[in-house]
Amino acid sequence: MPDATDTPAPTTGQRDLTAGPIGKTLLAFALPTLGSSILQSLNGSINAVWIGQFLGERALAATTNANIIMFLLVAAVFGFGMASTILIGQNMGRRDIDAVRRVLGTSLGLFALISVLTVGVGWIVAPAILRVLATPAEVYPLALAYLRVIFVAMPAGFLSVLLTMALRGTGDSLTPLKFMALGSVVDVALNPLLIRGYGPIPALGIEGSALATLIANSVSFAALLAYIYAKDLPIRLRGAELRYVLPDRALLKTIVVKGIPMGLQMLVVSTSALAMIGLVNRHGTTTTAAYGAANQLWTYVQMPAMAVGAAVSAMAAQNIGAGRWDRVDRITRAGLRMNLALTGGLVALLTLLDRHVLWLFLGQDAGAIGIATRINLIAGWSFILFGVSMVLSATVRANGAVVGPLLILAVAMGPVRFGLAYAFEPVIGADAIWWSFPAGSLASMLLTIAYYAHGGWRRGRIAAGAADHSAGEEAKADCEPAGRSMPVG
């Protein structure tokens, strides 16, 4: 294992998460992550405004269907990224930089293969996916055109997500914010130009919006990769280290075995969202557009939970790797307090201002605005409960306990959320769908609290495969899909 002299000095934005005051360190790490979430949400929301204002309600409904599919795709690989991030964090806690780079290399090789398969298979099966979603006939052509371009945009998006998560695993949440800002600016600037056309640029309609995402993803990924090498960050690969991109069997097994349950958690959320949008689509285009607009608000409500959860996970992983179990429970408690204050404040603010904000997405359609306002009133507050589950799950996953959170989520999203919505929709109509959200969040929170207190998750060791591999080498490292955004890791 490399000694202290092999460990690069911390770069700008990189933090040692195993020392210092917990609350201050957690906040300092979480704020850039929260900034990334804000940029993602603003990016998706502003683009939804462009689409809604320039192309109308049908186009907005089309992107609502397509964006859920995009979230499903990200979910399919996100678990591997989460497993890699935890391995990187634990190895950073041990100050083993070579192990960090081995994990990153294996992950890059895996993500590159998945990216190529996604483009080819996704383009072919896009029509079938939209039919399964019961996409309204008047929306289908727009959704198909948009979705196929989004499939092409996914490889750069996948790799950007991996690098962003890896950087956070090393304790650097500032660098991802910088390049999230770059991608967001490019996407937002190109959307109106490519949708409506300008000068020699032809009007591409909804395909132009998807093309803007493709260009923004590519620019952001290329710039981030160049920056990593220019600053010689811990996750860069040079010389003989480039062979790490060829997946190592032991590391790949660890990433896949631990990553599949974590990816399945997002797939459960995504599958639930697909099922819910299928129920929503039965109520017509106006309700689908209203639901899509409410989802835009929910991206903002989720931001504190996502940011604090990512910070808690990174801090817990490094402290577990360093053997600092005395700090892990304190990190969790600090995360819960921070999350409750921030999420509760946002819920209150958006409840007061929702009608004004919804107008941006739905224009003068009073019917859709009324439906969206009711959706937000019934379901919006449930994200306070969601935040509690997010923080507790982030801590237990940091030690490799991944099956328990998966089973809890499956129960909350399946029998509870979808089951209640499906059972009561014939009785009380669309309100059954909206009430199922707080029911599912409450079930998830209660079960997660019980698991955190009594689940035995502290006995897990996600880094076992990585640690054993590293030693051998030295002998001869839960959100609702909404908007057009990538998970923040």
Model-derived features with residue positions:
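Short runs within selected transmembrane alpha-helices of multi-pass transporters and secretion channels
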Residues: 81, 85, 149-168, 176-184, ...
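Structural signal for membrane-spanning alpha-helices in multi-pass inner-membrane proteins
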Residues: 122, 165, 191, 195, ...
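Helix-terminus/linker motif at the lipid-water interface of multi-pass membrane proteins
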Residues: 42-61, 130-137, 193-204, 263, ...
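Short alpha-helical transmembrane segments in multi-pass integral membrane proteins
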Residues: 1-30, 88-155, 201-260, 316-382, ...
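N-terminal transmembrane alpha-helices
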Residues: 17-55, 68-83, 87, 112-119, ...
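Small-residue-rich hydrophobic transmembrane alpha-helices
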Residues: 60-120, 157-176, 290-354, 386-409
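Transmembrane helical elements of multi-pass membrane transporters/channels
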Residues: 28-47, 149, 183, 216-220, ...
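Hydrophobic/aromatic residues within transmembrane alpha-helices of membrane transport systems
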Residues: 35, 47-51, 63, 88-93, ...
